[in-house]
Amino acid sequence: MELFSSQQWLALLPPIILCILLFSYVYIILWLRPERLRQKLRSQGVRGPKPSFLFGNIPEMRRIQQLAKSAHEQEAGSTDMFSSNYVATLFPYFLHWSRVYGSIYLYSTGSIQVLNVTDPNMVKELANCKSLDLGKPCYLQKERGALLGMGILTSNGDLWVHQRKVIAPELFMERVKGMVNLMMEAAMSMLNSWKNEVEDRGGSAEIVVDEFLRTFSADVISRACFGSSFSEGKEIFIKIRQLQKAMAKQSMLIGVPGSRYLPTRSNRGIWNLDSSIRTLILNISKKYEHDSSTSVNKDLLHSIIQGSKDGPFASCTPEDFIVDNCKNIYFAGHETTSTTAAWCLMLLASHHEWQSRARVESLDICQGRPLDFDILRKLKKLTMVIQETLRLYPPASFVAREALNDMKLGGIDIPKGTNIWIPIAMAHRDPSVWGPSADKFDPDRFANGIAGACKPPHMYMPFGVGVRTCAGQNLAMVELKVVLSLLLSKFEFKLSPNYVHCPAFRLTIEPGKGVPLIFREL
């Protein structure tokens, strides 16, 4: 007796063919194509951990991280928390693999093949490469699309060139000089609220500074770039912060095809936030266009709106251009600066001699006068403190690039599609570059500038490297100098006993449990 009739076989044939095609697609995308790429690099002596099918090295990364977490918990309290290398707990697999495979090695997260680089010569070539064939990883537009889209942080080719021409001039130092007064206004609003808190509590008060600094930085971005106050864009900042946290939880799933399309609770939350942020930004831009029709005010939002009307939009719409670039500015412009300010205050609170030195310099140079750009330029010790903070706690965790075509770097033929990552925190704490005190807070290392602090100087990269260096670094540095110099002139502060040193990766490296400080008015 036949198990299946011919009609039943015909009915089963389409799903069988579909399964075969699906398996073939998965096999080609997740194994055959990546394996060919890996083989090209292995043939040139590039080594790395053996990947598994479907998930690459993700299972091994999780195993190493769990072991590191257990070891860290056992050692808690036995080491100086300020001299410990948080890379060992946040990215322990990078440390492990670098010890096994050296300063250039290959690993995999699903379909994404990553060449991890800390070799100074290779970093220099990356920094000097001006070819558009070396761009931002394509996965960023897909996996981080809700947060970054195809804005200036993630786009490539002609679209990125256009975005850079539109946005970068608004953040040149000549424009930033004119923003000092509005930075002072935003900072004084925050500091006055702290002053009231200290007075209400009898001369000393514990303040968790993180959210205050986010509000301050968001206020600066709103006023300087979008012609509004923080209150008008508050909902956008809140939702972008929620989106950042949600996407950080998915960081290890990057490269697993289809994971972002699954209707999981996390993905549904991300989709809803993305939709809400898009609506809010478009509403602000429409209101801005209506209001500015009778005004001559020209700021960054004006430039973005104008740029949306004449760009190379084969890969995105004018509305996408506005939304994605505004999201990039909102996120990068306030989150990274506020995080650096929080780390800076933590380090000054735990190193009183440097707090005193920076305060004396600030009071001596300012002499009660309102801040201006010339005064800020003379604050050498404060600049050194900021530079050292950016070294120990860089706002960006990685320099991420992708070979958009076959190319050669560092004597290696890089196949198209290879991602190239520089783990900035590892490079910034490398004893062979920074000396035996690489993990210690020592602003004096920058006394003779970056070139005097490390050899070679291109290994210092808090704002990235090469042509894709952060366009907003001038704004960030001036903003940090303004808020820190004003704060130092009004308060002395120390770490609260409630402070827990717990760096966390949420797309940026930030204080995981906040920075509570005890303030006393001078």
From Swiss-Prot:
Residues 1-11 are lumenal. Residues 33-522 are cytoplasmic. Keywords: Heme, Iron, Membrane, Metal-binding, Monooxygenase, Oxidoreductase, Signal-anchor, Transmembrane, Transmembrane helix. Its cofactor is heme. One of its GO terms (biological process) is lipid metabolic process. GO terms for molecular function: heme binding; iron ion binding; monooxygenase activity; oxidoreductase activity, acting on paired donors, with incorporation or reduction of molecular oxygen. Its EC number is 1.14.-.-. It comes from the Eukaryota. It is a single-pass type III membrane protein. It is found in: Membrane. InterPro entries: Cyt_P450, Cyt_P450_CS, Cyt_P450_E_grp-I, Cyt_P450_sf, Cytochrome_P450_Monooxygen. Probably not involved in gibberellin metabolism since over-expression of CYP714C2 in a heterologous system does not induce semi-dwarfism. Belongs to the cytochrome P450 family. This is Cytochrome P450 714C2. It comes from Oryza sativa subsp. japonica (Rice). The gene is CYP714C2.
